[in-house]
Amino acid sequence: NSGCWQEGEFVTKDQCAFFSRGRGQSPRGLRFRDKRPDYIVVDDLDDDEMCRSEARVREMTKWVKEALFGCFGGKEGRFIMVGNLIGKNSVLQKMTDSDTVYTSTVYAIGKDGTPAWPECYTIELLRSRERFMGYRSFQKEYMHNPITEGAVFQERWIRWKRMLKLRYYESLV
């Protein structure tokens, strides 16, 4: 029996096995015959509710790094994580913060003002969605730029430096 793709497990004619697991389900012990996973894809792991909880993001990041990444076989495997960056506190953000992770970001509208996927979206459609959704929501859902409501300054604008000795300042507020 080659399984059923609708149930999340199947094997192709050339003996390539596919297994699906939901967020938080244990992948430990996953194998097909004597083979362990060598290719893992995670899609849209984050959601708004999770991003509001530092503890949940921390726990899910731990699950990805331990349970998921730990189920690779002895050889190097490929790990792909796709999704929109919907929160600064998110599993996707935590993963991309690692210097060992290669990141590719595709914005719905490129710097040149053209859609990244013109076969699906026209610039008129995207601008219409932006008008309907509002700037902040559009930035979050399409441009990987989660803007915290009420935030005046973007974090990337702030430059941190070691403070000089107090005698070098004329006044401080």
Regions found by a protein language model. Give the residues of each.
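ATPase catalytic-site recognition across NTP-hydrolyzing enzymes
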Residues: 113-173
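Short, flexible loop/turn elements at secondary-structure junctions
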Residues: 14, 22-24, 83-86, 110, ...
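A Trp-anchored, charged/polar loop motif used as the substrate-binding/catalytic surface
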Residues: 18-30, 155-161
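Signature of the SF2 helicase/ATPase Hel1-core->accessory helical subdomain module
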Residues: 34, 38-112
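Short basic/glycine-enriched coil/helix segment immediately N-terminal to the Walker B
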Residues: 12, 27-38, 166
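Conserved nucleotide-state-sensing and coupling region of NTP-binding domains
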Residues: 1-26
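Short, surface-exposed recognition loops and adjoining beta-strand edges that mediate ligand/DNA contacts
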Residues: 2-8, 106-107, 111-113
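Extended acidic/charged loop-beta regions that coordinate divalent cations
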Residues: 28-34, 108-121
